[in-house]
């Protein structure tokens, strides 16, 4: 023990210590009261003159020694004494390698922010020092340089504000993020706000197209409209009023201390009912792009153009839903700040402060464009979630339009233009073409179709009643039609009538875009006489180029009553009283022809469920004999419609044969208007009119389907009882007041006219009966005199001459007379090439010396292009039904000749 103690004492020599302190006192002479107790003197700190290497001492273990290595500088003699900051400097120098290693690892994963900017050094503060921490401070950017506003300015500086139309700029978010030295999510925030204003548009993933500010005023105009419809101005006023009420309540007499009362929290609750236009809780509605559009709307609808941040947050973020979690609300407010920073960089808003009773509030003022008067009214495609009500209404109109077009048959679409019809002249009759309609019915402008339709309808109604009291030139059918419509009636090249009564009035009526009706009415001295019926003995003319179906009511002896209504399918506007554009009344007209139904073959109407669909006429299974003198009236689609069925039924009904097989023969009606129209109410009103006046005429107009050529006809739906009463010997002459109207695509054809008042038939050659009907009886068929079909002439009821536009065709012999009517009519097919070569075609009815009888007429079978009911089947087989069809042959005598080149 003693040896060990001696050894310890030898190592620590008190004598040496005392000598050292004496030398120190002599040299420095700065310290006072030095205690030199030998028993207590132990070296607690290293000596100043001779620094001790602690690692070489045996009594210091590694745990007791410092971790940091000793630098070479520390081995040198230090002149300054130990200070309180000496340990801090040692710690900083020891930690600096770790800081450097950590920064090097960060450089491997991301670029240094704002590394390539030239003005970084000028904006940074110089840190004095030569340590590693000073170098890091130099490289680190400030918060201002990392702000979204400054980043947006750098982003916008890369692209032109108004690029050329031919210049296409593509933005790659990855390249922009690398060049600007920021993360890609920061670029996403900028691009989303720019996309809300249509400055950019998404092309692909992380690829956007740059459009510039060309469409910015139009976009702002659209957002202003949407904001007005969303009633954002009322919501802001309501919020401000509630805040004022809350202020008065808190700082009023009841609350003097100014502390918030938890019972007043209900005044701050803005439920969903306060904002009927608030969107649902969808993630898309809360996106930055949608929120940016709504934020701009608040400025555009505000009168002061100043919006505080809290009001915008309550309206756009829907505080009532995020009230339990205030952190989410604060996050959304930060999103509003991001939007405001981008809008500030675009020079649309600037930050201001609004001073209120509670202090200053952050707000933003709109400094962008406010006058949109010079901008056209075209709406841009704003997102559907901004205004779902408007989008739903627009798309609903398009769906309804498409449904109506697809619900009806292809041939019953609106009549096409004449150019399209002429291109389909030689098409197959049974192949309806549902081609592309005109621009008014295009789905590409479905949202504007209703506006154009209303404009055309209003203008046409006004012009119809103005022209009703005007007196244009006497004998010209020149209706005034709206410019918007492409289905205008083309005026005839020559006068319509050359008769004694030359005082005519022409007016036009149009319902929607369904077609025009031009009717010359006899002139009168007063407005009361203008309501006289056009179906007089000398002027029963109705020229209807493009209507689908109408019925014309008129009395034989006197004019129509003013209460005669006129309506077309799909509209209820009034046109002059002698026209009634209504659906056919099947049941009523069938009951009036009961005496003839007994002699007819079994013909049944279609079932109830087919009444609203396009009707079809079906011939019996076995065709009639050639000696029956089947004389079908050719309708607009080139097929024959029996006058028997047309006159007896009052229309062209839909019938079935004995086996029930339905063959579409003649298109009758089309539901081109309102599909929800109730036909039963119209039938009942028509029944009352017929029972009042038995001599009332109902004219049924059957139009040809679009693209098919032929003749349109106007048949009477009602006859007096004595005109249809059959005799015991044979079927007498059947008075058919009818009008033949050509297809509207074949040029200004005339009307084949038959007077509507029954009377004696003149058998003198070269004369046309003035007061009698066009007699299609068995014995008087050949006594009918002249009929004319001419592109520029009209039948003269009182003149014995035939007006023709071409004098050399006046004496032209009939071309290949019809085998059904030898010496009666000669017809050139309008769709044939022969018709194209001859601008005027004349049909002259030759007088036979003796009345033709069924036995004296021999019929030859010829193959025709249009398979009309009269030309179906073998001629020998048709002769077998001669006797059974005697009663029905009086009305089936007209057939288009097949002599023209096919």
Swiss-Prot record:
Domain of life according to the entry: Eukaryota
Keyword Transcription regulation in annotation: yes
Entry's Gene Ontology BP terms: chorionic trophoblast cell differentiation; DNA damage response, signal transduction by p53 class mediator; hepatocyte differentiation; negative regulation of cell population proliferation; negative regulation of cytokinesis; negative regulation of G1/S transition of mitotic cell cycle; negative regulation of transcription by RNA polymerase II; placenta development
Single GO molecular function: RNA polymerase II cis-regulatory region sequence-specific DNA binding
PTM-bearing positions, type Phosphoserine: 96, 411, 832
Amino acid composition bias (Basic and acidic residues), ranges on this chain: 253-269, 589-611, 679-690
Subunit structure of this chain's protein: Homodimer and heterodimer: mainly forms homodimers and, to a lesser extent, heterodimers with E2F8. Dimerization is important for DNA-binding. Interacts with HIF1A. Interacts with MN1.
Domain notes: In contrast to classical members of the E2F transcription factor, atypical members contain 2 DNA-binding domains and regulate transcription in a DP-independent manner. Both DNA-binding domains are required for DNA-binding and are proposed to form an intramolecular structure that is similar to the winged helix structure of the E2F-DP heterodimer.
Function: Atypical E2F transcription factor that participates in various processes such as angiogenesis, polyploidization of specialized cells and DNA damage response. Mainly acts as a transcription repressor that binds DNA independently of DP proteins and specifically recognizes the E2 recognition site 5'-TTTC[CG]CGC-3'. Directly represses transcription of classical E2F transcription factors such as E2F1. Acts as a regulator of S-phase by recognizing and binding the E2-related site 5'-TTCCCGCC-3' and mediating repression of G1/S-regulated genes.
Stated family: Belongs to the E2F/DP family.
Protein name: Transcription factor E2F7
Species whose genome carries this gene: Rattus norvegicus
């Amino acid at each position: 023990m003693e040896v060990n103690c001696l050894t310890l004492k030898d190592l620590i020599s008190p004598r040496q210590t005392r000598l050292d302190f004496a030398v120190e006192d002599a040299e420095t002479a700065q310290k006072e009261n030095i205690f030199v107790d030998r028993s207590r003197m132990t070296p607690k700190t290293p000596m100043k003159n001779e620094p001790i290497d602690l690692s070489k001492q045996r009594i210091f273990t590694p745990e007791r020694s410092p971790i940091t290595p000793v630098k070479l500088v520390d081995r040198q003699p230090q002149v300054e004494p130990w200070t309180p900051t000496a340990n801090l400097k040692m710690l900083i120098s020891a930690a600096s390698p770790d800081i450097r290693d950590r920064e090097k690892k960060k450089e491997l994963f991301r670029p240094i922010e704002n590394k390539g900017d030239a003005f970084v050094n000028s904006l940074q503060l110089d840190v004095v020092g030569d340590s590693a921490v000073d170098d890091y401070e130099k490289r680190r950017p400030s918060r201002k340089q990392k702000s979204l506003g400054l980043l947006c300015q750098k982003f916008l500086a890369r692209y032109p504000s108004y690029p050329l139309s031919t210049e296409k700029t593509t933005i790659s978010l990855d390249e922009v993020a690398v060049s600007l030295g920021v993360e890609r999510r920061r670029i996403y925030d900028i691009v989303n706000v720019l996309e809300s204003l249509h400055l950019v548009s998404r092309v692909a993933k992380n690829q956007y197209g740059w459009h510039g500010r060309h469409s910015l005023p139009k976009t702002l105009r659209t957002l202003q409209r949407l904001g007005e419809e969303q009633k954002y101005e009322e919501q802001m006023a309501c919020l401000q009023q509630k805040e004022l009420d809350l202020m008065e309540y808190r700082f009023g007499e009841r609350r003097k201390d100014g502390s918030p009362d938890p019972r007043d929290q209900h005044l701050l609750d803005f439920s969903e009912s306060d904002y009927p236009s608030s969107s649902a809780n969808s993630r898309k509605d809360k996106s930055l792009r949608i929120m940016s559009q709504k934020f701009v709307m608040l400025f555009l609808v505000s009168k002061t153009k100043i919006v505080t941040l809290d009001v915008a947050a309550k309206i756009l973020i829907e505080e009532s839903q995020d009230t339990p979690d205030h952190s989410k609300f604060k996050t959304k407010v930060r999103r509003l700040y991001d939007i405001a920073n981008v809008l500030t960089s675009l020079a649309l808003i600037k930050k201001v402060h609004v001073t209120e009773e509670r202090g200053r509030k952050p707000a933003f003022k709109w400094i962008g464009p406010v006058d949109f008067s010079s901008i056209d009214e075209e709406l841009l495609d704003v997102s559907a979630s901004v205004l779902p009500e408007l989008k739903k209404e627009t798309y609903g109109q398009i769906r309804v339009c498409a449904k109506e077009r697809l619900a009806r048959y292809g041939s019953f679409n609106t009549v096409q233009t004449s150019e399209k019809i002429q291109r389909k002249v030689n098409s197959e009759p049974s192949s309806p073409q549902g081609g592309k309609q005109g621009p008014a019915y295009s789905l590409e402008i479905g949202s504007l179709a209703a506006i154009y339709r209303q404009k055309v309808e209003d203008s046409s109604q006004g012009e119809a009643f103005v022209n009703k009291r005007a007196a244009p030139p006497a004998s010209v059918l020149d209706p005034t039609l709206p410019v918007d419509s492409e289905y205008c009636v083309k005026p005839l090249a020559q006068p319509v009538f050359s008769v004694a009564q030359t005082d005519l009035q022409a007016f036009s009526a149009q319902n929607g875009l369904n077609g025009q009706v031009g009717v010359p009415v006899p002139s009168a001295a007063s407005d009361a006489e203008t309501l006289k019926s056009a179906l007089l003995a000398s002027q029963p003319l109705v020229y209807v180029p493009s209507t689908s179906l109408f019925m014309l009511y008129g009395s034989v002896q006197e004019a129509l009553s003013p209460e005669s209504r006129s309506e077309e399918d799909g509209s209820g506007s009034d046109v002059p009283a002698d026209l009634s554009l209504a659906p056919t009344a099947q049941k009523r007209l069938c009951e009036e022809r009961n005496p003839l139904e007994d002699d007819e073959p079994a013909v049944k109407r279609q079932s109830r469920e087919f009444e609203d669909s396009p009707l079809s006429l079906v011939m019996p299974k076995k065709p009639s004999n050639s000696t029956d003198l089947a004389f079908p009236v050719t309708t607009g689609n080139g097929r024959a419609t029996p006058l028997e069925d047309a006159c007896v039924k009052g229309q062209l009904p839909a019938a079935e044969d004995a086996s029930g097989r339905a063959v579409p023969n003649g298109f009758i009606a089309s539901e081109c208007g309102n599909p929800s129209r109730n036909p039963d109410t119209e039938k009942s009103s028509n029944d009352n009119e017929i029972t009042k006046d038995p001599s009332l005429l109902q004219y049924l107009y059957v139009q040809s389907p679009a693209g098919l050529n032929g003749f349109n006809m106007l048949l009477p739906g009602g006859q007096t009882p004595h005109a249809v009463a059959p005799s015991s010997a044979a079927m007498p002459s059947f008075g058919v007041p009818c009008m033949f109207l050509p297809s509207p695509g074949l040029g200004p054809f005339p009307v084949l006219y038959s007077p509507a008042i029954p009377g004696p038939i003149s058998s003198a050659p070269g004369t046309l009966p003035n007061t009698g009907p066009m007699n299609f009886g068995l014995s008087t068929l050949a006594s009918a005199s002249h009929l004319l079909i001419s592109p520029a002439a009209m039948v003269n009821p009182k003149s014995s001459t035939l007006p023709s536009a071409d004098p050399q065709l006046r004496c032209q012999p009939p071309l290949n007379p019809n085998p059904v009517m030898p010496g009666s009519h000669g017809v050139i097919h309008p769709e044939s090439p022969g018709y194209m070569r001859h601008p005027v075609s004349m049909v002259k009815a030759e007088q036979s010396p003796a009345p033709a009888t069924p036995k004296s007429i021999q019929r030859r079978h010829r193959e025709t292009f249009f398979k009309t009911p009269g030309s179906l089947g073998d001629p020998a087989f048709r002769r077998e039904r001669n006797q059974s069809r005697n009663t029905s042959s009086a009305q089936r005598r007209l057939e288009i000749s097949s002599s023209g080149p096919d």
